[in-house]
Amino acid sequence: RLVAFDMDSTLIESEVIDELAEEAGVVDQVAAITKSAMRGEIDFDESFRQRVALLEGLEESALERVQQRIRVTEGAERLINTLRALGYKTAILSGGFTWFGEHLQRQLGIDYVHANELEIENGRVTGRVAGPIVNGERKAELLRDIVAHEQISLEQVIAVGDGANDLPMLDIAGLGIAFRAKP
């Protein structure tokens, strides 16, 4: 049995890329692209590349400052602890960044984390991600991989997310939950 969560605006209260945009001074540009992508109006991959490109030059120390501001959604820590006590595996499948997902993994005891690898060179964000972009289709693919690894069926999966890029994961899970869903 497995519960898979989106990260931004689901397990945590904020959208990390918007927090990073604040640090980079590009809030308005990134926020507009993010809203359109979450509503499914702009292709996620292209919008993601555009948003990440705007972060080019951001110092790695800014990621640490953002990490300090991130708040776990009320009740999420208790939910994860309860799921673990009941024998469930947990996963973060996020269009956000592994830098933050791995911190949450350590903090909450999450079993799996799959997100985008923010490329950092010489202590600065390059404006690119390493590896394939974790979009909606990739989330569903990663969920299938975890299910195979755990030797369970998709019917034994609960998936929780808030945006258009979560729909493929929610659709294949035994139970898909739209949490604070965007219109």
Enumerate the language-model features and the residues they cover.
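C-terminal cap/substrate-recognition subdomain and adjoining C-terminal extension
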Residues: R65-P183
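Conserved active-site and cofactor/substrate-binding residues in soluble primary-metabolism enzymes
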Residues: E15, I42, L58, R71, ...
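Short connector loops/turns at beta-strand edges and beta->alpha or beta->beta junctions
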Residues: G25-V26, G57, L118-E119
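Gly-rich Lys/Arg/Thr-decorated short loops/hinges at beta-loop-alpha junctions or inter-strand turns
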Residues: V30, E56-L63, N122-T126
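Active-site neighborhood of HAD-like aspartate-dependent phosphohydrolases
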Residues: R1-D45, R49-Q50
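Short, mixed-charge, low-aromatic patches
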Residues: A4-T10, I33-R39, E56, G96-L104, ...
